[in-house]
Amino acid sequence: EFTHSLKRFFCMCGFTGFYLNHEKSMLDLENIVSKMTDTLEHRGPDDKGVWCDPSNGLALGHRRLSIVDLSPSGHQPMSSRNNQYVIVLNGEIYNHVELRNELDAINPGFKWNGHSDTETLLAAFEEWGVEKTLDKSIGMFAIALWDLRSQMLTLIRDRFGEKPLYYGWIDSGNDGKIFGFGSELKALRAYPGFKNSISRNSLKQ
């Protein structure tokens, strides 16, 4: 009980990923994002997962610190029931039980896979859309959400920006400019060709 309370206090999952916007082999994507995800092992020692969309060059990786749902059903990256969304989440949705109750009232008999707030968010995205769901959500969180229908990547943070989220363009050479993101900068540095230097032009701005 004490250990679980500490987990809730620190709430340190971690995720990373990148978007090429062009086709790349599944093997290459998995190898790269797996190495990026490994840099975040200290944030999530309980589980590791990766998910890739080779047709778009999109890769997501997650390190899990089990907080709400300790079972394998809380594994991330997680896909929605209708296969429209894939999500990685760092943080906690405090009112996810209330959101579940509201969803259960709309869809009686809906069977949940587990008790994770991540699954609750995905079901809410399906029912209400992303913006309305976020309006209803209370918590501390950083999210990367891939919409397979619109082929759009959305990065999300809580209103106070409590959970870290770094992102930017990486000049990777062969792949051109890629969009990378992660819970820590070290995850971005693990991308091949990443240049660990400061842009003086950006500093001037």
At which residue positions do the language-model features occur?
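Cysteine-centered catalytic environments shared across enzyme families
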Residues: 11-205
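Short, Lys/Arg-enriched N-terminal segments with co-localized hydrophobic residues
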Residues: 1-11
